[in-house]
């Protein structure tokens, strides 16, 4: 009798533990929405300085310095305005990248690039969003963010401190990858590593976070876990780019009118 009671108790305990484990693991949509917020939508506004260090396969270095400014204008994680203003070197000085972000399914973000050498504003077509950002290994879409509606998401694993999520494009003909795998920190929900795969099943491009800092907003003192150093490696070309984010501040008053096309020049 004792053995039967012990067996029943063990089964009940295992079942209860399994229930707790299931309850503690959020569904994949919750994970990707939280990760998207942490990567792109922390604070109502954000500004800072960015340094890009670009190394080709032979170790030759090029560098870029720019200022960035962001403002959220929609309800929740929706409409967003983003601007990058290049400071150096001379060949890209005064170049401006402007994004009006939307999350409406079927609609693409509006992106513009001001090229001072030609005194021309170029509209970046949807098909060009996965091309190089200022000659670096980062892409335009890396900077402004990829819409969650463009991919199907599957939770592959939830161990070792990460949620591992596979993301497969709904329209594979629009992109150069077959899928990508994101490693999302279980505590902060920051995406810490992204591996992009071709149809061959081999990774060809890797984005990884090298440093995270808690940045306090000047006015409120609220802390925002922020990626301050990240790197992209192109496994096909052997090139890599390190992005360093500094002099960061959140929640400063920023006029929406600054993000108009007429401010590009």
What name fits each language-model region?
Residues 1-6:
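Positively charged n-region of N-terminal signal peptides that target proteins for export
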Residues 19-24:
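Sec/Tat signal peptide C-region and signal peptidase I cleavage site
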Residues 26-117:
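N-terminal mature ectodomain segment of secretory-pathway/periplasmic proteins
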Residues 87, 110-114, 120-148, 158-260:
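Gly/Pro-enriched, hydrophobic low-complexity segments
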Residues 8-18:
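Bacterial N-terminal signal peptides
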Residues 69-74, 102, 156, 185, ...:
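Short beta-strand micro-motifs enriched in acidic
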Residues 43, 149, 153-158:
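Long, terminal "pre-/pro-" and other extracytoplasmic accessory regions
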Residues 264-265:
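Short, solvent-exposed mixed-charge patches
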């Amino acid at each position: 009798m004792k053995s039967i009671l012990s067996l029943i108790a063990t089964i009940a305990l295992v079942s209860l533990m399994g229930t707790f484990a299931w309850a503690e693991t959020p569904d994949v949509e919750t994970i990707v929405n939280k990760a998207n917020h942490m990567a792109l939508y922390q604070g109502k506004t954000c500004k800072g300085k960015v340094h890009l260090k670009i190394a080709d396969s032979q170790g030759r270095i090029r560098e870029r310095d720019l200022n960035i400014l962001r403002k959220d204008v929609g309800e929740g994680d929706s409409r967003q305005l983003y601007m990058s203003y290049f400071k150096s070197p001379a060949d890209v000085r005064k170049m401006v990248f402007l994004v009006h972000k939307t999350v409406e399914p079927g609609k693409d973000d509006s992106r513009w690039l001001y090229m001072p050498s030609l005194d021309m504003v170029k509209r970046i077509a949807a098909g060009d969003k996965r091309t190089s950002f200022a000659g670096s290994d980062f892409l335009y879409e890396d900077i402004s963010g990829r819409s969650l509606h463009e991919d199907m998401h599957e939770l592959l694993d939830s161990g070792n401190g990460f949620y591992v999520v596979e993301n497969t494009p709904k329209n594979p003909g629009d992109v150069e990858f077959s899928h990508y795998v994101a490693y999302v920190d279980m505590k902060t929900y920051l995406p810490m590593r992204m591996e992009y795969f071709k149809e061959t099943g081999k990774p060809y491009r890797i984005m990884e976070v090298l440093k995270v800092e808690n940045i306090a907003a000047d006015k409120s003192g609220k802390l925002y876990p922020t990626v301050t150093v990240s790197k992209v490696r192109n496994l096909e070309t052997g090139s890599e780019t390190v992005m360093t984010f500094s002099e960061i501040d959140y929640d400063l008053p920023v006029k929406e009118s600054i993000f108009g096309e007429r401010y590009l020049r």
